[in-house]
């Protein structure tokens, strides 16, 4: 399974609208990637596994509630924010990146698939004035630096099964990197959720901010 069918395989309860939106992403990213490079050229054929399904790993760890607010930092072409926003249409997503061209792509794609629970802005995370329930990201920097940018952007009151904090998609050996932060965290191996080879070294780092 290499197209949108793989999403339905792992998330069997999608609505018709969600299935359509996921199916639209393939052609849209191919089209936009030729104009503005948001995914490496050799990787665009692996879009559904390496980018969309990878983003949705977060949904295997937490179910965002209606009204929840989620910040996606360094979203690039819209990952993990766009796939998560499709999956959780009643939650609110704010996608930010310091590179304007990437935000242009995010806005064009969300408009094309009529995804109305996303705001996208060209801004650095540390300049944001709001607070969110969760911050999500795909490995934009070492966790210690990332934590420094966003630890003041998380609401203290939690209404989810997990305390409010960071959900970070990252690969490789994370122990040394996490030890330098000296905070309590939990790792989830993505092989628990998905069987594709791509996920063998991939993890989610969950870091509650208030403890």
Q: Which residues are covered by each model-predicted region?
A:
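Class I SAM-dependent transferase core
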Residues: 2-66, 71, 101-118
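Conserved beta-strand signature within the Rossmann-like core of class I S-adenosyl-L-methionine
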Residues: 158-173
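Short glycine-rich anion-binding loops that position phosphate/pyrophosphate groups of nucleotides
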Residues: 139-142, 174
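Conserved beta-strand segments of alpha/beta enzyme cores
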Residues: 92, 117-119, 165, 186-189
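A short, conserved alpha-helix within the catalytic core of class I
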Residues: 143-153
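Conserved SAM/SAH cofactor-binding pocket of Class I
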Residues: 56-137, 147
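Active-site capping/gating segments
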Residues: 173-211
